[in-house]
Amino acid sequence: MTELKLIHIFTDGSCLGNPGPGGYGIVMNYKGHTKEMSDGFSLTTNNRMELLAPIVALEALKEPCKIILTSDSQYMRQGIMTWIHGWKKKGWMTSNRTPVKNVDLWKRLDKAAQLHQIDWRWVKGHAGHAENERCDQLARAAAEANPTQIDTGYQAES
């Protein structure tokens, strides 16, 4: 059995307004090589961008990997590590019997995460963590670039 590649992934989401124009930023490191990704949407929320960033990163990987995924989003980390299990048991309903917000992205993140061994880590945002700061720059630049792409999942919830 071959050993899985160890990939370090850093993600961040940004939104100007919430809702408003938004973007995500990703920095991926593997054996000294760095790949950056970002994209923006015309109308979305900060939480949707915080979820979309790890989804895009994980979906970009072509094989199962061992991943250390670092984000400044407690919402994303708590959701994928803790809340999602109850949501799935309850048919994607919260403990208050209301539909889970951003369910389209939670389902995508859950599916993308299944292929990998992931250590979900949290870092305080805007605290000088180099990769997190870079993700923030990428996400903010994508949100500020007058994006025209539509976040169809957000539009459906409006």
Swiss-Prot record:
Q: Which UniProt keywords apply?
A: Cytoplasm, Endonuclease, Hydrolase, Magnesium, Metal-binding, Nuclease
Q: What GO cellular component entries does it have?
A: cytoplasm
Report the EC number(s), separated by commas if there are several: 3.1.26.4
Q: Which reaction does it catalyse?
A: Endonucleolytic cleavage to 5'-phosphomonoester
Q: What class of enzyme is it?
A: hydrolase
Q: For this UniProt entry, what is the primary localization, expressed as one broad class?
A: cytoplasm
Could you give the subunit structure recorded for this chain?
Answer: Monomer.
The record ties this protein, via HAMAP family, to: RNase_H
Family per record: Belongs to the RNase H family.
For this entry, the protein name equals Ribonuclease HI
Q: What is the lineage of its organism?
A: Bacteria, Pseudomonadati, Pseudomonadota, Gammaproteobacteria, Alteromonadales
Gene from which this protein is expressed:
rnhA
